[in-house]
């Protein structure tokens, strides 16, 4: 409730608010002229004669300690109870208040305060008689009326249903009643039977539930075993893949090894180890030049290395054939290889030289080269024993220490260095290497092709 004061007219304006939307209300002018009779009619609760009898109402009021009330019968069958004015005026209310302000005289202020108090008490009584708090604005009242209309329609429909049921019951005779009793007994028996079936079903349900728990436990165990088997399978699968990779790797290695083996089988050890060729006027073995020219002074270390490879080649060919040389024994010793005389073992014939003045006066180097030529001749003769068609391109004269160019110029070239030119000595060495190359080819064809 709100209040405002106007100082010119010395009047007080008081307004109430809606109990739902809290909007300020402007009361109707009829609230200003309320008399006691009107107030009693507005605040009296509505009861029908069927719901409450006068005697019972009076007895209840007497027992409850309430003040007596006046019941006024009406033509519409509704009794109205009126609360005595003295009680209403003395009721303490939540809307009660004391008006303090200025007025033209004391009587007017007292009348205004009394009227507002009566109005507030009236709203409290109306709120106590119903489930709705008062006052309400017009919109909230319309909403409330719509709700009450809905409840009224529902209640009327229920009432109509009850009336129809009552009419049906009143129209039924005794036979129908007995028949209904029999049906009721049958339904009771059916209910007992269904209850028994329900109990049996409940027992079966418990049994099925127990079986279900067992099956679920078994299923869980099987799931665990399946997971374990899956893990083992995955591990075995991984191992299988690793073994497959290893197998493929081994197979690849075997194929590669087989290819290498086939290649090695086709490879001639002598041809691969001893490569005899020529470089200009020089005969070469494993890229070492054998001989020297005035225009090309080959180092003696290279010549000695070439002689070492040559001795090693003839020694290997003889061992392959099982040939043992007469008069001399080959001793491969790198660039210090030599021949050992079988008649005089203390005599060594070196196939190496350092040059200088000593080279011209010491003839051991020449004797060693002639002895080596003798060994080549023995190798040729050994081959001819088994292969009569075998022939070397250059004929060798061991006694003179010369090699003849039978297929070319027909000249003879000494293998010695003393009293010989470097050109002829180099050519003789070249022809000797050519004969060894032919011997190498024959040995390869006889032993390795088989």
From Swiss-Prot:
What is the organism field in this record?
Pongo abelii (Sumatran orangutan)
| Gene name as annotated | BECN1
Tell me the domain comment: The C-terminal evolutionary conserved domain (ECD) contains poly-Gln-binding domains such as the ATXN3 poly-Gln motif, consistent with structural docking models revealing two highly scored poly-Gln-binding pockets in the ECD. As some binding is observed with BECN1 lacking the ECD, other domains of BECN1 may also interact with ATXN3.
Name the segments for region: Evolutionary conserved domain (ECD). 245-450
Q: Which GO terms describe its biological process?
A: amyloid-beta metabolic process; apoptotic process; autophagosome assembly; autophagosome maturation; autophagy; cell division; cellular response to glucose starvation; cellular response to nitrogen starvation
Stretches for region Disordered: 48-72
Q: Please provide, in alphabetical order, the Gene Ontology terms of the cellular component aspect for this entry.
A: autophagosome; cytoplasmic side of mitochondrial outer membrane; cytosol; endoplasmic reticulum membrane; endosome membrane; nuclear body; phagocytic vesicle; phagophore assembly site
Mainly resides where?
cytoplasm
State how it assembles: A homodimeric form is proposed to exist; this metastable form readily transits to ATG14- or UVRAG-containing complexes with BECN1:UVRAG being more stable than BECN1:ATG14. Component of the PI3K (PI3KC3/PI3K-III/class III phosphatidylinositol 3-kinase) complex the core of which is composed of the catalytic subunit PIK3C3, the regulatory subunit PIK3R4 and BECN1 associating with additional regulatory/auxiliary subunits to form alternative complex forms.
Q: How this protein is processed and modified after translation, per its record?
A: Phosphorylation at Thr-119 by DAPK1 reduces its interaction with BCL2 and BCL2L1 and promotes induction of autophagy. In response to autophagic stimuli, phosphorylated at serine residues by AMPK in an ATG14-dependent manner, and this phosphorylation is critical for maximally efficient autophagy.
Q: Which InterPro entries match?
A: Atg6/Beclin (IPR007243), Atg6/Beclin_C_sf (IPR038274), Atg6/beclin_CC (IPR041691), Atg6_BARA (IPR040455), BH3_dom (IPR029318)
Q: Which Pfam families match?
A: APG6, APG6_N, BH3
Task: Tell me what this protein is called.
Answer: Beclin-1
């Amino acid at each position: 409730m709100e209040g405002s004061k106007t100082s010119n007219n010395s009047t007080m304006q008081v307004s109430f608010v809606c109990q739902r939307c809290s909007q300020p209300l402007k009361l109707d002018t009829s609230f200003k002229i309320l008399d006691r009779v009107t107030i009693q009619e507005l605040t009296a609760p509505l009861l029908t004669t069927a719901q409450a009898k006068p005697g019972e109402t009076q007895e209840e009021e007497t027992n409850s300690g309430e003040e007596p009330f006046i019941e006024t019968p009406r033509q519409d069958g509704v009794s109205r109870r009126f609360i005595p004015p003295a009680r209403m005026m003395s009721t303490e209310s939540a809307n009660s208040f004391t008006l303090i302000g200025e007025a033209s005289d004391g009587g007017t202020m007292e009348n205004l305060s009394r009227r507002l108090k009566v109005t507030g008490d009236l709203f409290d009584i109306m709120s106590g008689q119903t489930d709705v708090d008062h006052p309400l604005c017009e919109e909230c009242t319309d909403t409330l009326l719509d709700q009450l209309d809905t409840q009224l329609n529902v209640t009327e429909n229920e009432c109509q249903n009850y009336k129809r049921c009552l009419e049906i019951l009143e129209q039924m005779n005794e036979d129908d009643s007995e028949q209904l009793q029999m049906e009721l007994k049958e339904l009771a028996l059916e209910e007992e039977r269904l209850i028994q079936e329900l109990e049996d079903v409940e027992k079966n349900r418990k049994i099925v539930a127990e079986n279900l728990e067992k099956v679920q436990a078994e299923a869980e165990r099987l799931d665990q075993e399946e997971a374990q088997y899956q893990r083992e399978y995955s591990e075995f699968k991984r191992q299988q893949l690793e073994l497959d990779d290893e197998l493929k790797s081994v197979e690849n290695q075997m194929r590669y090894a087989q290819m290498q083996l086939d290649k090695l089988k086709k490879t001639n050890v002598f041809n691969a180890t001893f490569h005899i060729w020529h470089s200009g006027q020089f005969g070469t073995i494993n890229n070492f030049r054998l001989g020297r020219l005035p225009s090309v002074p080959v180092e003696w270390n290279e010549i000695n290395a070439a002689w070492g490879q040559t001795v090693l080649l003839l020694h290997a060919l003889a061992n392959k054939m099982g040939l043992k040389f007469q008069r001399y024994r080959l001793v491969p010793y790198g660039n210090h290889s030599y021949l050992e005389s079988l008649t005089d073992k203390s005599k060594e014939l070196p196939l190496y030289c350092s040059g200088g003045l000593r080279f011209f006066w010491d003839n051991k180097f020449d004797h060693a080269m002639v002895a080596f030529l003798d060994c080549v001749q023995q190798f040729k003769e050994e081959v001819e024993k088994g292969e009569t068609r075998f022939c070397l391109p250059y004929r060798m004269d061991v006694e003179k220490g010369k090699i003849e160019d039978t297929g070319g110029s027909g000249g003879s070239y000494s293998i010695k260095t003393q009293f010989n030119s470097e050109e002829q000595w180099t050519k003789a060495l070249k022809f000797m290497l050519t004969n060894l190359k032919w011997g190498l080819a024959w040995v390869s064809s006889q032993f390795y092709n088989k």
